[in-house]
Regions:
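Short intracellular "coupling" helices and adjacent cytoplasmic loop segments at the cytosolic face
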Residues: 267-277
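Alpha-helical transmembrane bundle of multi-pass membrane proteins
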Residues: 1-269, 286-545, 549, 569, ...
Length: 581
């Protein structure tokens, strides 16, 4: 009755939700409107921090490690391929086929990732979020065995197969980790915890650069072990992840396990009384019973969310077409072309890796203050300018030897710009731009584009570099600047905004209907799916506002039945699926 009285404009003071950053209502205004000054900021509990660090270390970090692990031992891997080919067929490989085989080794990681991203929906529905992450660790153990014993068995195919399996694992985890963290994170910590995996991606790259030093695993005899080190974080996650609860939303809404969800909430929040959160998820469960999950095909055909869909496609494709993977895969080659002595290159790359981690930390600790748009726009602009700078440096380094050091600075700028924003914000934006019914399809679409572009860049960059020379980086410059311009013109800021407000912004751009002027009622939502409804009584048409029915979180009722149904954007139909997850 508390929510209904608020919708009717009556004063009420419901108990604050334990997870909402702004769930308290001001009793003094007499209208039940949110008062941000009286908002409740949820503290970061030890279980929340621990599980975030564990899945970031055991899953996200492996993605960064596998991106950079083929960089240092590239010469040794090519020598192994050449020697094996000579033993089998009596002659070595020509430079062209050898480059093709090595490019396949690099890019098959992305092909596996593409396959993994397509399996995410099926896996999380069957095994849950935590269960999917635990089972995916077994893939890493299998891949480590293939790559670790490849030289002993004289099989280059085992290296390629192992790389594809690690890609399969990465494709699964890049979507499941933010999904899991988003469902267990309080609203005021969603951005902070959501960018934590991107820090570990940078840390994975840094770890590969350090272990690839000649004093450690960079020697010729150690490269199979260097590739197989991934089994260590995966084993740790496999052993410890079962100590933490499954996602409460998954347990209650999808498995109808009220007791399990209650216990999980108590563990994550560190408080005994979680009945408000449980009741709220029950209301969401009842509302979702009438909502059908959208497929990728339906998502692409739905004109009501075409700008959201295009935005997710642009930022995910731009994330890879920016050339960051070319920088990570071929850092040694870039530095060698820039004139850095070969003996100094491994130490130079380690320095860039340390800067990556620092840049990731800056983005993680500033996203809740600066917002999503400034981080991603600044990051892409920095990457574009530095890509053009690399071209300029490579062209002038013969006449101006000091330009080689500017080229190194440009590489550092590209990596730092990427880690500050574009590395993690696209995954966060996918959750925030879509409602519950559209979100799984959006993750499949964004993840597929991400990995497809990853494969394309990893495969064609060596040939692009051979044909275009220094000018190949101008392609990446153009992509980065275009993505930054698109985000500036189209994508709204989503920090501290409800899904109604975000979708209303997109609806105004589509000019489907005028912006609604109803009072906003912020419900005390949980995790990444907190929503709100526009409360105005019983709407009777497009111009009269939105009718609030039973007061459930997703707005399963529409007043007298003549209000406007909402899902993932205004103007998607009258009396259709309603509310925001």
């Amino acid at each position: 009755m508390g929510e209904e009285s608020q919708a009717a404009g009556l004063p009420s003071s419901p108990p604050p939700h334990p997870l909402s950053a702004d769930s308290s209502l001001s009793p003094a205004d007499g209208k039940g409107t949110p008062d941000p000054s009286r908002g409740i900021t949820r503290r970061l509990t030890f279980p929340l921090l621990s599980v975030t660090l564990l899945v970031s270390f055991g899953s996200s970090m492996l993605y960064g490690y596998n991106l950079a692990v083929v960089n240092s031992p590239a010469v040794h891997i090519k020598d192994f391929y050449n020697a094996t080919w000579s033993q089998r067929y009596g002659h070595g490989l020509a430079p062209g086929p050898l480059t093709l085989l090595y490019s396949l080794t690099v890019s098959t990681f992305a092909l596996g990732g593409l396959g993994g991203s397509l399996l995410v929906g099926l896996l999380v529905a069957r095994y849950g979020r935590r269960g999917t992450l635990s089972r995916s660790s077994l893939l890493v153990l299998l891949a480590g065995g293939f790559m670790g014993f490849s030289r002993e068995l004289g099989s280059p195919e085992m290296v390629i197969i192992g790389r594809s399996i690690t890609g399969l694992h990465a494709g699964i985890c890049l979507s499941v980790v933010p999904l899991y963290l988003g469902e267990i994170a309080p609203k005021n910590l969603r951005g902070f915890l959501g960018l934590m995996p991107s820090i570990f991606i940078c840390l994975g790259v840094f770890s590969a650069q350090v272990l690839g030093l000649p004093e450690l695993l960079g020697k010729e005899r150690y490269w199979p072990l260097f590739l197989a080190v991934v089994v260590v974080p995966a084993s740790l996650q496999l052993l410890l992840l079962h100590c933490f609860p499954e996602s409460p939303r998954y347990l209650l809404i999808e498995k109808n396990d009220v007791c399990g969800a209650t216990e999980a909430l108590r563990r994550f929040l560190g408080m005994p009384d979680v009945q408000d959160a449980v009741q709220e998820m029950k209301e969401e469960q009842r509302s979702l019973s009438s909502v059908e999950t959208t497929s990728v095909g339906q998502l692409l055909r739905d004109r009501a969310v075409r700008w959201q869909t295009l935005s997710v496609a642009v930022v995910n494709a731009g994330m890879q077409l920016s050339g960051i993977d070319a920088i990570w895969f071929y850092t040694n080659t870039i530095f060698e072309n820039a004139g850095i002595p070969r003996s100094q290159i491994p130490y130079t790359t380690v320095g860039t890796g340390a800067i990556e981690v620092v840049a990731g930390l800056i983005g993680c600790f500033t996203i809740e203050k600066l917002g999503r748009r400034p981080l991603i726009i600044t990051g892409f602009c920095a990457m574009g300018v530095c890509s053009a700078g690399i071209t300029l440096c490579l062209l002038l380094q013969t006449a101006l030897p000091w330009m080689r050091y500017v080229a190194v600075a440009c590489v550092v700028g590209i990596i730092a710009g990427f880690c500050m924003g574009p590395a993690g914000v696209p995954f966060l934006m996918t959750a925030e731009l879509f409602t519950q019914s559209h979100r799984p399809a959006a993750y499949v679409l964004g993840g597929s584009l991400n990995w497809l572009c990853n494969f394309t860049i990893g495969f064609i960059f060596p040939f692009l570099q051979m044909s275009a020379g220094a000018f190949c980086y101008l392609v990446f410059c153009g992509v980065c600047l275009l993505v930054a311009l698109y985000v500036h013109l189209v994508v709204p800021e989503t920090k501290n905004k409800t899904f109604v407000e975000i979708s209303r912004t997109f609806a105004a751009r589509r000019a489907v209907l005028p912006a609604c002027r109803g009072a906003t009622l912020k419900l005390r939502g949980y995790g990444a799916l907190e929503g709100s409804l526009e409360g105005s009584g019983s709407g009777s048409g497009l111009g009269s506002g939105l009718g609030l029915g039973s007061g459930s979180e997703l707005g399963s009722g529409l007043g007298s039945g003549s209000g406007l149904g909402l899902e993932s954007g205004l103007g998607s139909g009258l009396g259709s699926r309603s509310g925001f997850a």
